[in-house]
Amino acid sequence: MQIDILGGMGMETKEKAVQAQTGAAKGKKSRKKGWAVVIGVLLAVIVVAIAFIELSTLPRKDTADDVIYIGGMVSSDTVEYADGSGKGLLRNPVVKIMQMVWRYCDGGDKAKHAAQNPPTVTEVNDLAYIEDGNLYHTLDVLYPADTQPGAKLPAIIDIHGGGWMYAEKGLNHHYCAALADRGYVVFNINYRLVPDVTVNQQLQDVARALRWIRDHGSQYPCDMRNIMLTGDSAGGQLAAYSAVLMQSAQLRKTFDTVDPQMELTALLLTSPVAFMRDGGLFSLYTKPMWGTDYKDKATYPYMDFDQIIDYARALPPTYLITSSGDTLANKQTHRLYEVLQAHGVQAEIKDYAKAEYNQSLPHVFSVLQPFEPAGTAAIDKALAFYQQAMTAKAAQ
C-alpha cells in the first residue's frame, strides 16, 4: 500500500509539473504577445508623431496670408532663403520639434499683440538693407508722430528674439512703437532664421543692417552720435556679439562680417542667451543653432560670450533685464552681468522679483508686454540708463 501511494503521488507530481510547464509556456507566450502589442503601439505613436510634426512644419509661400515666420517654413518662387550653412539641420530632431513649438508660440504672440494698443508713431516699413528680395533682409524705422522738421533724436536699434529660429521684426513692433513714442528713432531689424542659416549668418545679417543704418540713418530725424543697440533673448545674444564684433577686425574676419563702422553709446540686453556652448541642458538646443558641423567651424571657440569679450576694446555701458519668472535666461543674464563686470564694463542689472508686481514676470516681459505696469517701468528704467550714458558721453 505504501508503495502504491508513493507511486500515485509520484504520478500526480509529474502531472502537476507538466501542467506547470505548460502554464509557464503559455504565460511566456502571452507575455511575448503583450510586449509585441506594446511595441506595435509605440511604433504607431512614433509614426503618427513624426507625420504630425512633418505636416505641422510644411513650408508656406512668403506671399501667403497665413505664412508663419519660422526658419525652414517659408518658401518663395523667387528667393532662396536657405544658403547651405544650415545643411542637415532640417533633419535634426531638436530643430524639427522646435519648429512645431515655435509654430504654436506664434499663435500666443499674435493674441498678445491683438490685445494691445500701441501708440501711433510715424513708420517707414520694409526698407531693404540688402537688395536681394529676401524679406528677412529688411528693417523698419519708427519715430514720434509729432517729430518736428530738423529734429535729431537719439537712436535705438532693436534685434528681436525667437530662439534664432522664429519670428520677424513684427514680433517687436509694439515694443519698438513704445520706445519711439518716448522720443527716439527706432530701427527694427529682420535677420534670416535657423535652419535656413546658422547663428554666424545671422550675425552677418545684423552687421549689414547696422552698416545700412550707419549709411542711411541721417535720412531720418536721427542723431547718429547716440545709438543704443538692444536685443531680447536670442536677439540679446546677437546684440552682445555684434557689440564686440564692431571692435575687433580679427573677429570680423573669423565670423566673416562687414565692419558697421558704428560706435554705440549704450547696450540694452533683455534676458540674453549668450552662452550657447556651455549653457547646461539648454545647450542641446543652442549648439545646433551654429550648424550640424559646429565643432569643425572657425567660430567653435567663440560660442560663449566669455570667449569673445577680450576682443572688445571697450564695450559701452550695458543694462540687463531679467525676472524671477524668466526660467529660460535668468541665470544666463546674471552670468553675463558677472562677465561684463569682471572685464571692467559699466553694467547694471535689474532682476524683477515676484514681490515687486505680485507675480513672477515671464521671459522678456518688457518686450512682449510693454504696456503693462511692469513692462512700462522696465522700459523707463532702461531708457533712463541710456540717457545717463548720453550725458556722460557728452561730458567727455
Regions found by a protein language model. Name each.
Residues 34, 38-396:
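Alpha/beta-hydrolase superfamily serine-hydrolase fold, recognizing
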Residues 3-34:
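N-terminal Lys/Arg-rich, disordered targeting/topogenic segments
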